[in-house]
């Protein structure tokens, strides 16, 4: 049941269970509620890399404390794979996010329709993923337990930044 599911999370052994999300600012844009990370997060960025990706791109990572900001997407077919734990796909106005389940085979997934994908901002740490789509029009928070595979794979039909 639910108790067994909650207690199966890897962080239970470390003495904690639930997630504390990053601070965010709420605002109204075009009559819709949006969310974005607070500006103060920009001040704590370290080791910033700007990468232009086209076709298949692999980004090697030393840690799972990551912020990825992809812009200039122009609604193309695109996918992001974070260590085979979190996968994000966009194609034909469909955004699909898959998160590897920590104690069963397979992935949990959420799917939403969006008219276009302009940008995506992803924050990761050892056990949490936060995804901001189109300047916070859609926002997702997941428990995601990353393993030793620390690479990010990006596949796109056009150049993204």
PLM region spans:
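Beta-rich accessory regions
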Residues: 1-161
């Amino acid at each position: 049941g639910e108790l067994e599911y909650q207690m199966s999370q890897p962080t239970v052994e470390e003495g904690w269970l639930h997630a504390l999300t990053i601070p965010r600012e709420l605002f109204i844009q075009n009559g819709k509620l949006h969310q974005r990370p607070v500006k103060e997060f920009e001040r704590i960025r370290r080791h910033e890399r700007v990468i232009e990706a086209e076709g298949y791109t692999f980004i090697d990572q030393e840690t799972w404390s990551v912020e990825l900001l992809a812009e200039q997407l122009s609604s193309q077919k695109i996918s992001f794979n974070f260590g085979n734990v979190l996968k994000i796909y966009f194609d034909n106005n469909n955004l699909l996010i898959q998160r590897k389940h920590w104690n069963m085979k397979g992935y949990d997934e959420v799917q939403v329709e969006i008219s276009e994908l302009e940008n995506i901002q992803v924050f990761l740490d050892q056990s949490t993923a936060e995804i901001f789509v189109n300047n916070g029009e859609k926002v997702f928070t997941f428990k995601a337990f990353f393993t030793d595979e620390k690479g990010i794979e990006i596949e796109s039909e056009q150049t993204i930044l």
